[in-house]
Structure formats: C-alpha cells, structure tokens
C-alpha cells in the first residue's frame, strides 16, 4: 500500500471504468490525469514560507514551464511518511501534509486488479487539478463522477450484500444494527429492510438531504 490517505483508495469490490466509458461522458481521458498535478501557481498556497525548500528538496522541473514532478524517493505518500518519521516539529508536519496533498492531486486512480481500468478520485472537486479544467471538462467529469459514486454500483453492491450479510445476521441472536450514515448508495435502505437490520438514526445527521435535522415522526 503506497497511500497514507484514503483519497487514493478504491472500493472493493467495485466496477472500475475503462477509458472508453470515461470518454462516453464527453470527458477526454489523458494519461497525465493519473499523475499528480503540481503547478507553480499554487505551491505558495500549500507550503507558504517553505515553498522554496520544498521545490529544492522534493520536486523536480519538467519540460513544461511551471509544472513539477515529485523527485524519485518521494513519489508516494508512504515514501514521504517514511522520510518524515522522525521529524515531528510543526514545520515538518506542515511540509509532510502538503506533500501528501500534492501526491493525491490526481483525477483518476488506476484499478489495482484490472489494467486499463480507472476510478475517479473521490472528493477531487476540491483540489487544484479539478480547478485547472475548463468549465466543459468540469461538467463532463462531474457527470461521470456522479454516475460512478451514486448509481453505477447500486445493483452490484446489492448483489454482494445479499451474498454476504445473511450469513452474518443468521450467525447471531443479537440485534443487528447497521451504520448507514454519510455517503451510502441507494440500495442500502432496501437491503437493510429486507434483512431486518436496524438503521442508525441521529437527529443531527438526517438521511434526507433537504433537512437540517431529522424529524422523529418520519
């Protein structure tokens, strides 16, 4: 495992996307979207007074003006973590976290099992590589992102759940409760209902996105 943060992970099991599927949404796939996008324009925002130190010690220039790559030995978050393992001062932590963010600044993550298949990186809309896209590219990417994270896996995960969860629920006499808060696929509610798994209800975290607080009557 080369990543420290979960942003570079992938669901298991999952249905990764081929280049052709990605481009069917009107988004042109490029190999550079798999590499960290590191541009001169935002390094100061990430590293502040440590910018020049970072450029000299962790980055290398490319043939494209203003674009950098990570130096060998610092190309993965795990390599960065190992380098800073005995450096616990505030400045070192600042630099380490900044380097983590550079390395995760990718649009797609290659699938670990299927060559030529990819996952849109979760939460990438908040990162610099997404901001570098044109408005048309952002719109196309958001369409494929929404399809991947909120629709593509529904039936697949429902099938997976019905294979595995009954063995768990039938193996105990305890009351079973599922943690179904946050980002969950639409199939979760029906699966839990079919298997009589209790839902976790917290009034401050309503399942209806239109409500700020949950209504006890619902």
Predicted regions and their residues:
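Catalytic cores of glycan-processing enzymes that make or break glycosidic bonds
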Residues: 1-218
């Amino acid at each position: 495992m080369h990543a420290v943060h979960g942003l570079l992970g992938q669901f298991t099991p999952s249905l990764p996307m081929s280049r052709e599927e990605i481009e069917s949404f009107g988004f042109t796939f490029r190999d550079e979207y798999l590499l960290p996008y590191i541009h001169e324009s935002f390094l100061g925002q990430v590293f502040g007074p440590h910018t020049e130190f970072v450029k000299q010690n962790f980055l290398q220039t490319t043939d494209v003006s203003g674009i950098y790559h990570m130096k060998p030995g610092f190309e993965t978050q795990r390599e960065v973590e190992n380098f800073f393992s005995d450096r616990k001062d505030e400045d070192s932590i600042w630099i380490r976290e900044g380097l983590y963010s550079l390395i995760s600044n990718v649009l797609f993550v290659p699938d670990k099992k299927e060559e030529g298949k990819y996952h849109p990186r979760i939460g990438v809309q908040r990162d610099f590589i997404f901001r570098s896209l044109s408005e048309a590219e952002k719109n196309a990417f958001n369409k494929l992102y929404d399809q991947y994270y909120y629709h593509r896996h529904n039936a697949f995960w429902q099938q997976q759940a019905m294979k595995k969860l009954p063995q768990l629920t039938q193996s105990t006499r305890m009351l079973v409760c599922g943690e179904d808060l946050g980002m969950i696929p639409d199939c979760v509610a029906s699966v839990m209902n079919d298997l009589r798994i209790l839902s976790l209800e917290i009034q401050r975290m309503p399942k209806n996105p239109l409500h700020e607080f949950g209504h006890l009557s619902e």
